[in-house]
Structure formats: C-alpha cells, structure tokens
Regions:
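C-terminal motif of bacterial Sec signal peptides marking the signal peptidase cleavage site
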Residues: 15-18
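Short acidic, S/G/P-rich loop/turn micro-motifs used as interaction or catalytic elements
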Residues: 73-78, 106-107, 151-152
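Conserved helix-turn-beta segment immediately C-terminal to the redox Cys motif
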Residues: 64-65, 78-102
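N-terminal "domain-start" segment that seeds a small globular fold
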Residues: 23-59
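Short, internal strand/loop/helix patches
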Residues: 100, 110-145
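Short active-site neighborhood of thiol/selenol oxidoreductases, capturing the structured segment around
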Residues: 55-81
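Thiol-/selenol-based redox modules, centered on thioredoxin-like
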Residues: 143-217
Length: 217
C-alpha cells in the first residue's frame, strides 16, 4: 500500500499556499478512481456467513450504506484493526451505516462473509483484484459508490466520503469536495464543512487540518 500523507506542514515547501495546492492535486489524482464502478450494482450477489448461511446482499443490508472491507490472504494488521474499530465507533450513531467484512481468500478462521459461486457473484469477484485489504462503499441501492475507497486510517477523508455516501454520493465527488474545501491556511473554507466536522467528531476543527489518502494495490 502506498500512502500519501495529506499534511499541510511540509518543510520542503517554500510557500505554504503552493505546497497546499501541490498536495491537494496529488490527493485528487488518488481519489479520481473511486467512482470507476458506480454503474455496477451488487444487490443480487450471494454472501455466505461464518455459519454457512447464504443470503443476497440486499436481504442482509436493506436500506443501509455498507462499508465493505475486503481482503485476500493478507489480513488486517494490528494498526489497521485499530483504525477500523475507531471508524466503526465514530459511525455508531448513524443507524443507516453498517460495516461488513469480506474474505476472498482461503482464510476460514476469520469472522467474515465469503462469496458464493453463482453467476452474479462471480462478476463481482472479478473486480476484487486486491493485494492489500481494500474497502468498498456500497450505497443503499446496492451501487458501488467507492471502489477501493478510503481506508479507516485516512483521517477525515474516510469519514466524509462514508457520510456523504448515506445520501448516494459517489466517493470521487465527495472526496474532491472535501479536498477543494480546504484553503491555503489549512482550514475549511465553508461553514457547511465546519459544521459537519463539529457534528460528526463532536469537537471543533483543529487549527491546522491534516488527513491522508491511501492507494490500494
């Protein structure tokens, strides 16, 4: 996994404003692929739970926005587990958001869903070419709103993208809105973003904002 730290305090930059623009430009390049598969709907794929029960995705998650964390044989590290748990805690107050784990490898010990072998599910499996654990944000209608989306450790970004997905917004659009919404003083430009941050995190924004953007192999 390559990780681009979206930190506005970069000592190698001569001018803070130009540095901010450079980092924002790099971040936009990373998030532009989140919406590659918004035309794909996975409502009808079959998932198998840890007890061997098989159900369709839309039966399991009716009316829910799903943060679907998938991995092959490379499981989450201790740090990844921690950031994932903290993300779940922050979204516990939203009843329309759920978190689900999906194992596409040979790990039989994990408490995660696995994919069935029917035709519709096989098409989704073909999209899951991942080396590192990767999140997929699924909308309430079953559309893939964020493909290899922001990871739990992607501070602020993952929260905003998942929050906006509750209203059907695709990951690229919401991520770019957030990135664009930070000014040269490392602060939110709009009252809307400041209010969202205060409500979601239950605190006022820091004087110097920082967040990160991760790519998935």
């Amino acid at each position: 996994m390559k990780k681009l730290s979206y930190l506005f305090i970069l000592p190698l930059c001569l001018m803070a404003s130009s540095c901010t623009m450079m980092v924002k430009g790099i971040a936009k390049l990373v998030v532009k692929d989140y919406n590659d598969y918004t035309h794909i709907n996975i409502s009808n794929i079959q998932l198998i739970d840890a007890k061997g029960n098989k159900k369709q995705f839309n039966e399991l998650f009716t009316g829910k926005t799903v943060y679907l964390y998938a991995w092959d044989n490379k499981r989450l590290s201790v740090e990844q587990e921690k950031s994932y748990r903290l993300l779940q805690e922050r979204f516990a107050k939203y009843p329309d958001v759920v978190f689900a784990n999906l194992n596409i490898g040979s790990d039989t010990a994990s408490n995660a869903f696995k994919l069935a072998d029917d035709g519709a599910t096989s098409k989704f499996r073909d999209l899951l070419k991942i080396g590192d654990p990767a999140p997929f944000i699924i909308g309430k209608d079953g559309a893939i709103l964020a493909y290899k989306g922001p990871k739990p450790a992607d501070n602020i970004l993952v929260d905003y993208v998942l929050y906006e997905a509750r209203n059907g917004e695709n990951g690229t659009k919401s991520a770019k809105q957030l990135i664009k919404g930070v000014n040269g003083n490392e602060q939110f430009k709009t009252a809307k973003l400041r209010d969202w941050y205060s409500s979601h995190f239950s605190k006022n924004p820091d004087d110097k904002l920082s967040f990160s953007v991760s790519t998935t192999n």
